[in-house]
Amino acid sequence: MLTTETASNLKVLKRLDVITAECVYGMNIFKDILASLSDTFGGRNKSIQNTLRDARRTALTELRKEAYSLGANAVIGIDLDYSEISGGGKAGMLFIVASGTAVIIEQ
């Protein structure tokens, strides 16, 4: 899995398809309160950092599974996008999209 389209030591034999993986995580009210305290007093909020890390890992794992289901042995040009979805005063949701190109590389 690469964030770049090319690497000097890898030869792309075939580009299969653009692939994506999406994950949505609920950010409960307690995490929101802790985040606001961290914002007020400074410092890092480990609870939210852990949620972000879990979301990233899950999205990349799902992206890898999607690539393998197409017969790819690599993913290039990986991009991660994070968004927050909130509405109606309810606890927000973290939405992450991982995208890339499923390829077959020379082994």
UniProtKB/Swiss-Prot annotation:
Alphabetized InterPro entries for the sequence: UPF0145_dom_sf, UPF0145_YbjQ-like
Transmembrane segments: none
Gene3D superfamilies cross-referenced by the UniProt entry: Hypothetical protein apc22750. Chain B
A Pfam entry, by short name: YbjQ_1
Family named by the database record: Belongs to the UPF0145 family.
Name under which the protein is recorded: UPF0145 protein PSHAa1882
Organism whose genome encodes this protein: Pseudoalteromonas translucida (strain TAC 125)
